[in-house]
């Protein structure tokens, strides 16, 4: 008996638009409950929605970024269901004619690149938010500030084979939306939410069976998503062995994931499309989009995406997979690097400095590269001093610290403190000879194979030069001189 895990994802991304999807209320996170609402948000009688054109523009841009086909006629539908945080009793969404279809993303797996197909991207509005207070057993509250917030829902094909692939797909999608400034994609504040559909294909003696699909909710991190998938795979294997439930006989159900226990718990049977009683939104007209409009959004707003940037950086600068992945994790960090290497003779060394020293400072201070107080050109100049052997790597770190403290270029600090390395071979030979003449016992110890003698003499050389001598060159000249003694 063989099991194949099948995973599909439904991702809701709240767009960072100034106003909501179908009214003029501000689209912001948090704030005083029920302070950003209007009759349209609440679905009061007589209120009429109007489409936020930026919602359509964002959907078109997302379609371009995911290689999707973009529909030329936009239609909105009413999706009916009853829940306390949905005051209208329906959600404005898209049913049979989503704005984008047939897209795909490439993800990187241990065995190479894998294409994950995207079934559809559609536009809709968010619901309100139910608040259940810990100090009250009988009362719940509803904040409608989120009601009507603009959403895109991305539905992947069931092409994902394990938790790692699911996380890779979500990470790639999040990177794209952040690069395009479409959304912060923050799972903590709910601007990036994911439901995971999981089932198994069981092969018994050449006959295939499909287990019931579990739609898993309450997933608040990539770690939770991976853990839920791994648990659900084992649960469905055990359920198949005991009860042999199939998709045809049991259909689809919803389960919640409990972070503390690491298990999924059944919530309800999943609604079918007919349960939602979809019909075309009568208060919103069909919207026609021509090719010029679609192409114009692509030309104006579609920038180089992370995957393409990684391929280019590896080819252009010979950087490692780790380096390019880290540099492209933030488009502002990538821009900082690109600005720093424009006039650099050693792009790899610039990358190393940004990924080690600069990122260390950013992480320690909890700031972004946009808030960093040194310009890319400052890093370029500092690295050039190292490449030219004018300062050592150790000295460069001290210079870097003073650069940040004083907000001045490396050249100013190096000049003021006379920190340039001594790399003149004639000068170094003179210092080496002085040390050899002053330490005949160390020479004898070296000839007897005592390695510590070399360290001692190098220490004396560094002391005589006040630490300014080029240690690599000094060590070479010392060994040459000892060979001739």
From Swiss-Prot:
PROSITE patterns: GATB. InterPro entries: Asn/Gln-tRNA_amidoTrfase_suB/E (IPR017959), Asn/Gln-tRNA_Trfase_suB/E_cat (IPR006075), Asn/Gln_amidotransferase (IPR018027), Asn/Gln_tRNA_amidoTrase-B-like (IPR003789), GatB (IPR004413), GatB_Yqey_C_2 (IPR023168), Gln-tRNA_amidoTrfase_suB_CS (IPR017958), Gln_synth/guanido_kin_cat_dom (IPR014746). Its EC number is 6.3.5.-. SMART domains: GatB_Yqey (SM00845). It catalyses: L-glutamyl-tRNA(Gln) + L-glutamine + ATP + H2O = L-glutaminyl-tRNA(Gln) + L-glutamate + ADP + phosphate + H(+); L-aspartyl-tRNA(Asn) + L-glutamine + ATP + H2O = L-asparaginyl-tRNA(Asn) + L-glutamate + ADP + phosphate + 2 H(+). Signal peptide: none annotated. Pfam families: GatB_N, GatB_Yqey. GO terms for molecular function: asparaginyl-tRNA synthase (glutamine-hydrolyzing) activity; ATP binding; glutaminyl-tRNA synthase (glutamine-hydrolyzing) activity. Keywords: ATP-binding, Ligase, Nucleotide-binding, Protein biosynthesis. It comes from the Bacteria. Belongs to the GatB/GatE family. GatB subfamily. NCBIfam families: gatB (TIGR00133), PRK05477.1-2 (NF004012), PRK05477.1-4 (NF004014). Heterotrimer of A, B and C subunits. This is Aspartyl/glutamyl-tRNA(Asn/Gln) amidotransferase subunit B. It comes from Borreliella afzelii (strain PKo). The lineage of its organism: Bacteria, Pseudomonadati, Spirochaetota, Spirochaetia, Spirochaetales.
């Amino acid at each position: 008996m063989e099991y194949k895990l099948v995973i599909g994802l439904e991702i809701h991304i709240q767009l960072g638009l100034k106003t909501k999807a179908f009214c003029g209320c501000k689209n912001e996170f948090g704030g005083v409950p029920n302070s950003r609402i209007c009759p349209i948000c609440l679905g009061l009688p007589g209120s009429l929605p109007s489409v936020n054109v930026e919602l359509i523009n964002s959907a078109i841009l997302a379609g371009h970024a995911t290689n999707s086909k973009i529909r030329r006629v936009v239609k909105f539908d009413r999706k009916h269901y009853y829940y306390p945080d949905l005051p209208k009793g329906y959600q404005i969404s898209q049913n049979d004619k989503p704005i984008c279809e047939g897209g795909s993303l490439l993800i990187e797996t241990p065995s190479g690149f894998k294409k994950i197909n995207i079934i559809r991207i559609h536009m809709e509005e968010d619901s309100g938010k139910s608040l259940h207070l810990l100090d009250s057993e009988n009362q719940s509250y509803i904040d409608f500030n989120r009601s009507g917030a603009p959403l895109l829902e991305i539905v992947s094909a069931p092409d994902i084979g394990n938790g790692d692939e699911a996380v890779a797909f979500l990470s790639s999608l999040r990177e794209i939306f952040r690069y395009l400034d479409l959304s912060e994609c923050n799972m903590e504040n709910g601007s990036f939410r994911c439901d995971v559909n999981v089932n198994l294909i069981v092969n018994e003696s050449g006959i295939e069976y499909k287990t019931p699909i579990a739609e898993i909710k309450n997933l608040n991190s990539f770690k939770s998503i991976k853990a839920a998938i791994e648990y659900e795979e084992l649960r469905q294997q055990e359920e198949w062995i005991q009860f042999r439930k199939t998709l045809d006989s049991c259909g689809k159900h919803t389960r919640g994931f409990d972070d503390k226990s690491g298990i999924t718990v059944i919530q309800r049977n999943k609604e079918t499309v007919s349960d939602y009683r979809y019909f075309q939104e009568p208060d919103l007209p069909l919207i026609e989009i021509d090719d010029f409009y679609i192409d114009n959004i692509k030309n104006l707003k579609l920038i180089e995406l992370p995957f393409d940037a990684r391929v280019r950086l590896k080819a252009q600068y010979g950087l490692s997979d780790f380096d390019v992945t880290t540099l492209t994790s933030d488009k502002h960090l990538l821009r900082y690097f690109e600005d720093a290497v424009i006039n650099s003779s050693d792009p790899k060394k610039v990358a190393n400095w940004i990924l080690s020293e600069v990122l260390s400072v950013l992480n320690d201070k909890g700031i972004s590269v946009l808030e960093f107080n040194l310009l890319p050109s400052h890093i370029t100049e500092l690295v050039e001093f190292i490449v030219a052997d004018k300062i050592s790597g150790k000295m460069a770190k001290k210079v870097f610290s003073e650069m940040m403290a004083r907000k001045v270029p490396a050249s100013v600090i190096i000049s003021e403190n006379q920190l340039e390395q001594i790399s003149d071979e004639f000068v170094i030979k003179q210092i080496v000879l002085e040390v050899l003449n002053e330490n005949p016992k160390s020479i004898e110890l070296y000839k007897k194979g005592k390695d510590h003698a070399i360290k001692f003499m190098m220490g004396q050389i560094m002391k005589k030069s006040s630490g300014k001598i080029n240690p690599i060159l000094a060590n070479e000249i010392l060994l040459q001189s000892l060979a001739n003694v």
